[in-house]
Design a protein with these regions (language model features):
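A short, flexible beta-alpha/helix-coil linker loop
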Residues: 32-36, 145-148, 173, 180
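A generic structural signal for beta-strand entry/edge sites
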Residues: 22-26, 136, 216
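C-terminal substrate-binding/active-site "lid" region of AdoMet-derived donor-dependent transferases
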Residues: 151, 158-225
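Hydrophobic, well-ordered secondary-structure segments
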Residues: 50-52, 82, 123-133, 138, ...
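SAM/dcSAM-binding transferase cores
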Residues: 1-18, 34-40, 58-59, 191, ...
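A short, structured beta-strand/loop element
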Residues: 21-37
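The AdoMet/dcAdoMet-binding core of the Class I SAM-like
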Residues: 6, 21, 40-169, 183, ...
């Protein structure tokens, strides 16, 4: 097990082997699991919500074609590894608040050979507005929310509008939201995204839509209409039981 103290967060980060899956490792921060990485097979994604995000990435461009992707909240760079494995030559950019975290992750869990990743250390919204982050991107992934204690300046309709402006014409914004029943925070974030575009979907384990369980939901939003064939593909891809809300059902869920 390797560890490092994150001065910005005031928490201890650890990376340790996942005994269930050979060649895999878990990143924990403050004792809570944050990321899972399979070094032997980076094209395999363990966490359910991230598998759903990866499934959208699979649909967003022809198979194997490189993409431009912006990761806001880097974690253990699991998705960056996935894109390099499935779309070699992708141009990737990551914004991470904790320099110590990113250094620790890359030192302990090296990126796949050939990974083209540019890293920006700072606040996600500040870097998007004033930094060197320049679109267009085929994917923008925001993965910083864990319920009501989320950074307020990131959980706004204005910020989602800024992120949508970074997309290529057929690009996708993906927002991971962890929440507890009755999913009030997740519903507010979905509503905030819908203020800027009606072309969106909500992805989750189907049981999450009852609002009786804690877990993650993923908002996927576009500037162009949501392809209905994507809904069928995502339902088939899982993880199962997969749920996808669009159109009137999506608006009703947002409230």
């Amino acid at each position: 097990m390797a560890g490092r103290f994150l001065r910005g967060a005031g928490l201890h980060a650890e990376i340790f082997p996942d005994e269930r899956i050979p060649g895999s490792y878990i990143l924990a921060i403050g004792g809570a699991e944050q990321s899972h990485v399979n070094l032997k097979h980076p094209g395999e994604v363990f966490y359910e919500y991230l598998r759903r995000i990866a499934n959208v990435a699979d649909l967003a461009a022809p198979p194997g074609a490189p993409m431009r992707c912006l990761h806001l909240g880097a974690g253990a760079l699991t998705l960056a590894r996935y894109l390099q494995a499935t779309r070699p030559g992708s141009e990737q950019h990551a914004v991470e608040l904790e320099r110590e975290l990113l250094d620790f992750v890359v030192d302990q869990l090296p990126l796949p050979e050939g990974t083209d990743l540019t890293v920006y250390i700072g606040d996600a919204r500040h870097e998007v507005a004033f930094g060197d982050v320049d679109g267009p991107f085929d994917l923008v992934v925001l993965d910083v929310f864990a319920g009501e204690d989320a950074p307020e300046h990131l959980a706004t309709a204005d910020f989602y509008a800024e992120l949508l402006e970074l997309l290529s014409p057929r690009g996708v914004l993906l927002v991971n939201i962890g929440d507890d029943p009755p999913l009030a925070f997740a519903k507010r974030q979905l509503g905030a995204v819908l203020e800027s575009t009606p072309h969106a979907a909500l992805l989750a384990d189907a049981s999450m839509f009852s609002c009786r369980h804690p877990g993650n939901v993923v908002v996927a939003a576009r500037r162009e209409p949501w392809p209905q064939e994507w809904t069928a593909a995502l339902l088939a891809a899982g993880p199962h039981p997969a749920g996808v809300l669009t159109g009137a059902e999506l608006r009703s869920f947002a409230g």
